[in-house]
UniProtKB/Swiss-Prot annotation:
UniProt cofactor(s): NADP(+)
Binding site for substrate: 168, 179, 186, 200-203, 213, 292
Protein name per UniProt: ADP-L-glycero-D-manno-heptose-6-epimerase
Annotated keywords: Carbohydrate metabolism, Isomerase, NADP
Subunit description: Homopentamer.
Species per Swiss-Prot/TrEMBL record: Pseudomonas aeruginosa (strain ATCC 15692 / DSM 22644 / CIP 104116 / JCM 14847 / LMG 12228 / 1C / PRS 101 / PAO1)
Pathway: Nucleotide-sugar biosynthesis; ADP-L-glycero-beta-D-manno-heptose biosynthesis; ADP-L-glycero-beta-D-manno-heptose from D-glycero-beta-D-manno-heptose 7-phosphate: step 4/4; Bacterial outer membrane biogenesis; LPS core biosynthesis
Binding site for NADP(+): 11-12, 32-33, 39, 54, 75-79, 92, 143, 169, 177
One BP annotation, GO: ADP-L-glycero-beta-D-manno-heptose biosynthetic process
Co-factor binding details: Binds 1 NADP(+) per subunit.
Domain remarks: Contains a large N-terminal NADP-binding domain, and a smaller C-terminal substrate-binding domain.
Family: Belongs to the NAD(P)-dependent epimerase/dehydratase family. HldD subfamily.
Amino acid sequence: MSIIVTGAAGFIGSNLLQALNRRGETDIIAVDDLTDGEQFRNLADADIADYLDQNDFLERYARGDFGTVRALFHQGACASTLESNGRYMMENNYRYSCRLLESSLELGVPFLYASSAAVYGSGRTFREARQYERPLNVYGYSKFLFDQRVRRALPQARSQVVGLRYFNVYGPREEHKGRMASVAYHCYQQLRRDGRVELFGEHGGFPPGGHLRDFVAVEDVARVNLHFFDHPQRSGIFNLGSGQARTFNEVALAVINSVRANADQPPLSLQQAVESGLLGYREFPESLRARYQSHTCADLELLREAGYRDDFQSLEEGVAGYCRWLARSA
């Protein structure tokens, strides 16, 4: 009786593998596209039963080749909010997901998939309801449209279907994402490379470094996925963030002070970090002005109603642990 994880060599998928392994789960089929061969590193320390290319997997899954499947965690997608090829995005994120959903419903396999806070666009209300969903780019639209497909399927579904709208996830195993890696990752790399961190300046009424996001540690994301795995009677679409909006300045300062703590140096205030030259700002990119989420904050009411009671790591806790992991991995 296997568990299947798509996007298994990716950021969240590989952390989910680790969380499953810690539970003693090893009968896992990992599915991904290893065209970028370096991503094998995210699989190298995981215990799995098999690996399949994402295209080979699709047909075999539809045929029921894998016998009894305990759950399918669908984490595979193009996650770039800057991707402009709509045909590629819709085929990879929407059509592929639709095929997996249809097969899962036919086979009676619990289907837990990655949605995104990008569906909310520039709104100020982040609640799982149609009137608040206004994506700003084709990535957000691909996630939005699949969520609509799921909403239509849920009333007739005889097996679990869960969509988790990830907010700004950060943590280990994301370095392959390049520009799409988290703010915390880029702050750490800038500090190590240049001796300082540089953030976006003022935009949309927000001061330099003052844009607000809901940053959530990847370990918490894995735990929420496993909560729904443990409760297959619960279905729906749920926000997955910390429930708190924090500024980019706070992320940068958490990174700076985590690195300083590891070097037995005292913490700095934001003003001290700026005055010492450890933190600076650059002009907000013109190319992002029309499609940038300046503020996100997950409404967790539905998630709590679904029985998830654990606290989320604070930004300072999560970033400190992440910086220690990055230092060990250097």
